[in-house]
């Protein structure tokens, strides 16, 4: 195989930020013990920030972005993998601190890789990507509420930022688990799309993007929040007793103005979802959970 490959390369000199496709030599790849022929990658919110100006996430240049990829191992210095193994990578700060997947060839730590299940194609793995992993972890967190409460049924689940990657896959997964999903979105033109994913109801974002009450009428057994800010604060105020909230995004704001009443009077639980650094065992479990996969319902 040729030692030459192409990649998107970011550079910054002073105030000048640039991005271009370059031909590189494999010696350019600095880190890792497994070399992968990249077949697919995807585009996440974080990728967009990095491609725009580094997003304050990239510390060293030149840099190859792309936080996710799937492909085949072509060379391994680690006994965990051999040539020909099909693998998936999401997170672990690849594409930020380490060179990423917007490249024909990637070289990464073996501990960052998951073997691709046989019944999931390389393309389907990137249809899911980080967004899919995060949303499935969120769905499992809400499902776990039933186990924690000895079978107390989850019925009504709210998904914010519903037209985004995490929100869209969360709707599919939660619907397949049998929950009644309500989607929050500011995009009225996407109502048919959200219903096609399984959302039973759609609420305009403006209903949530306002100052919250300390505690409100309990409406939701579970919440998947991808946006933060006032929208999350209102969702917390509206969560039913013993409800669980998966916090997995900050598209609206990093801020959260809430109070103790929903926690003390209703016993609600907030579960932060860090899919970027979760264990390999947890990743392997999630990608093997075939009946919740997005591509079975929605392949766009």
Question: Could you say what each language-model-derived stretch is?
Answer:
Residues 90-157:
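NAD(P)H dinucleotide-binding glycine-rich loop of Rossmann-like/cofactor-binding domains
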Residues 161-168:
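Glycine-rich NAD(P) Rossmann-fold beta1-alpha1 loop
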Residues 175-231:
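Adenosine-nucleotide cofactor-binding segment
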Residues 243:
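Glycine-centered, small-residue-biased loops immediately flanking beta-strands
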Residues 253-265:
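Rossmann-fold NAD(P)-binding glycine/threonine-rich loop
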Residues 290-297:
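Conserved small/polar residues in nucleotide/adenosyl-binding loops
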